[in-house]
Amino acid sequence: MITWHDLYTVLTAVVPLYVAMILAYGSVQWWKIFSPDQCSGINRFVAIFAVPLLSFHFISTNDPYAMNFRFVAADTLQKIIMLVLLALWANLTKNGSLEWMITIFSLSTLPNTLVMGIPLLIAMYGTYAGSLMVQVVVLQCIIWYTLLLFLFEYRGAKLLIMEQFPETGASIVSFKVESDVVSLDGHDFLETDAEIGNDGKLHVTVRKSNASRRSLMMTPRPSNLTGAEIYSLSSTPRGSNFNHSDFYSVMGFPGGRLSNFGPADLYSVQSSRGPTPRPSNFEENNAVKYGFYNNTNSSVPAAGSYPAPNPEFSTGTGVSTKPNKIPKENQQQLQEKDSKASHDAKELHMFVWSSSASPVSDVFGGGAGDNVATEQSEQGAKEIRMVVSDQPRKSNARGGGDDIGGLDSGEGEREIEKATAGLNKMGSNSTAELEAAGGDGGGNNGTHMPPTSVMTRLILIMVWRKLIRNPNTYSSLIGLIWALVAYRWHVAMPKILQQSISILSDAGLGMAMFSLGLFMALQPKIIACGNSVATFAMAVRFITGPAIMAVAGIAIGLHGDLLRIAIVQAALPQGIVPFVFAKEYNVHPTILSTGVIFGMLIALPITLVYYILLGL
């Protein structure tokens, strides 16, 4: 029977964690002590130092030779049951998908054991429960988070193949991933070079695109180009290594540059005199267009009649060409469409380089559509200009991404990218851009995947590159190795090293909760995914997870306090690491965010209810 003293002991252990979280929340939302940049620095410290050292402290001080294998087996069986059920649902039903499989698996089986579980379970069931929680933490860090990464990278590899090789994926026999590609999460533009070997099979090389590399070296200029910038090969046309004489010849000048100001000055409404910086959030599309000086000999209209071109090309062939000159009739067509569009309309520039001679009109249906303004082809270089309105377009796109600039980030991006990819026929030097797909990873069910061994090797390479950059990987492995050595030969850690670690690990628990409070304060809404989806997520977290754990525990033979500890541990709030992965790979991040934030708020009363009911 649970007494009031037992409840007070639990509250004594848990309430201080919530105090740290509330202080952090108030520091941002109420008192405005920390700016978002400062919050980012604190979170960085917690992620790199505090939490890894906290993990190392708990793992290295836990005796691995005294593990309760029955308890560990029950925890493992719970996760295997959920994984098998979700895999069957995803593959055998129409509503199933890989994304929902990953999300439900994260919600139901991966709780916040390190930060919340250890102090809570120690207060409820004693120090032995804390030792069991450490065993769960070891398995989470080494096995289950790695499996989660594997699933996310499998999704990324599947999307890559579906986008780039929709009909020839089964012919791929090898992938070579260049060293600067860390993940297939879609944050970087990627290129694929496919070479046909002597056996007629495809050998694919995956690398970062030139645009992605250049973007790391440039400070992008804030722009009002909303969602259309996603498709530009650079985030801004203002800074580049473009040949300025070519640029001026296109604009109608007979010679090279006529002054010491560049394209950034021309298209910015800010003065170039003095140290005034270029970035501005002024709506330049709504302002008066300032063009070049009048030139009577020019056969091209004034520069103010059409916007600045994007002077950067993505080349897959190594051949350079000059930009295409625009015929008068197409310029008039641009002017007419610009006058008809609303003042919020944006123009999308797409420069596509292809070794194929197929015209752009083959992709865009002859160019007679409302969106296509101009198209030319000179030595394989094609320019596509598309007027993109801020108003949402009617489309059959499925959900799975935010609507940016009137284009659904799932279907709209794939639609345009498939068009550009269609310009490049499959050959020995074909290249294509990989853009991050939306939340829905479903697609062409007829797409054939490469052999399992090829896919597995690609995914393992990417998972390995992610793991070796994660401090928690090192802290967990080193802590486990030290525990195996220390408890086998009774070796003590040197005092200097022990104190150096403990001074930071002691702050790890409070800093982790403080960081969580900062994260909550920076979110626009506590429930970001809608009430119905949030209710479903909470039901999976606090009902389905403990129920499956009870079934697994009884099947293994747990009883008494061991079974109670297993069930309460499964009812802890959502773990933070699955949310971080969901954010990186853009797979239902709002659901995991709600699971972390709202779950943390309601976790204490729910775990207390489980504690009281199981103690009856």
Swiss-Prot record:
Induction: Down-regulated by endoplasmic reticulum stress treatment. Signal peptide: none annotated. Residues 302-343, 390-411 are annotated as: Disordered. It is a multi-pass membrane protein. Homodimer. Acts as a component of the auxin efflux carrier. Plays a role in generating a sink for auxin into columella cells. Maintains the endogenous auxin gradient, which is essential for correct root patterning. Involved in EXO70A3-regulated gravitropic responses in columella cells and in root system architecture (RSA). Together with PIN3 and PIN7, involved in the connective auxin transport (CAT) that ensures communication across the shoot system, and modulates strigolactone-mediated shoot branching control. This is Auxin efflux carrier component 4. It comes from Arabidopsis thaliana (Mouse-ear cress).
